Amino acid sequence: MIEKLNFHLRFKTNFGQTIYITGNHPLLGNGNIEKAVPMVYLNEDYWVLHLATKGLLKAETICYSYFIQNQDGTRIFDWGSDKSIIVDQLATKELVLIDAWNFTGYIDNAFYTAPFANVLLQSKGLQVKAAHPKNATHIFRVKAPILTTNQSICIIGEAKEIGGWDATKALPLNKIINQPYFEIALNLSKCDFPLVYKFGIYDTELKKFVAFESGNNRVLYEPVSKNKLVVVQDGFAQVGHNQWKGAGVAIPVFSLRSKQSIGVGEFSDIKLLADWSKKIGLKLIQLLPINDTTATHSWMDSYPYAAISAFALHPMYIRLSELVDSNQSHLIQDALDQQIALNNLTVVDYE
């Protein structure tokens, strides 16, 4: 049963800024931003929060995040939803969570969006059998969205328990299913602290160390003590930023003409574009704005960036034949009679 819960956030704030923590538990404001709990400034690198939790944590999953409040009341939010505590999986009296701030603008975050996570990078991140001792004192978690086939993440450092900087003794991390991070649990009870370490790339097929991450060594100051578990959520491994490359096509919808179009590309033509892109190996499709631009009812409305609404889509991209059934086809017959002539034009007859 967790009796003490300690949050440590690595972040350098400016004068007048305060960091808050919010989460789906009464101790963290129960999801209400206005009831978020302020953290305490420790030093130029850390903000902390210590909570007494004896008897207050059930077998539940607590999701939490951080935000910065400036002197003028504006807020900057930590990006993502991967910070969580699965209470019944952590058998300890004291839990220390050492987190890294996730800036929205980090390029790595783009690779966790739906197109990459569900399609383009779906097969990446192979499972590795990582060590997980029952008497673990520390758990390390790190994210690495851009890895090639047969690559995983490993940890290596100064202490002999993490390889003693011997690349042949690097320890592979396991990719956690349905989570964005890799993880390894270690017993560091015989290590000297501060602990100096780095993450690296590990070849899961050859079972060997490939390369160190870029940047400075990482340093962990939280030592071992009885009945305490330290979970280090280390942000992103500094690897692979330039490993993913994908060709794509940028095109306005109005230029997509198929045999079913009536002189202008339509939303339904995007399916054909997607099929063609897949066939020739393209990875991305960028469309020019598709918002309604009808303002003057003249050719001047053809400029796709002159939107009159941020929400309304342009009606000219609708496929008329998909709006009517066989009993209503006469309603669009006039347009269908001009279909071939309009499709043969070199430019869109906007008026």
Task: For each feature predicted by the language model, list its residue ranges.
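Extreme N-terminal starter segment of soluble prokaryotic enzymes
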Residues: 2-6, 246
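A short, amphipathic beta-strand motif
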Residues: 5-10, 137-144
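Aromatic-rich carbohydrate-binding modules that target alpha-glucans
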Residues: 12-58, 69-90, 146-193, 202-224, ...
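Residues lining hydrophobic/aromatic ligand-binding pockets adjacent to catalytic sites
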Residues: 46-48, 128, 163, 179-183, ...
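Exposed beta-strand face motif in extracellular beta-rich ectodomains
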Residues: 60-64, 193-197
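Compositionally biased low-complexity segments at domain edges in trafficked proteins
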Residues: 93-136, 145-148, 225-260
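Extended acidic/polar, glycine-enriched regions
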Residues: 215-241, 269, 284, 293
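Acidic/aromatic-lined carbohydrate-recognition and catalytic surfaces
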Residues: 239-351
